Amino acid sequence: MSEKRDPYDHDPASATWVKSPFSGDDNGSCVVVARFDNGDVWVGDDKNPNRPHLAFDKAEWTAFIQAIEARDPRFTA
């Protein structure tokens, strides 16, 4: 089994942030995502770019997206 790497271990200058198509322009919460070649993903808030972002490795991000798509009750309001 390979050693788990830290998904935060990227140069922030190399991050290209993309705004979610589900984020509106109405001054609400806007989610931005940066994807890296190895599958890591960072998630941030474009209204507060200096706040810490979340980092997921490829397996974590895949599990998160699958849970959202399956309407997992842990992620529904």
Give the label of every model feature segment:
Residues 1-18:
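Negatively charged, low-complexity tracts enriched in Asp/Glu with abundant Ser/Thr
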Residues 20-59, 63-66, 77:
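A short, structured beta-strand/loop element
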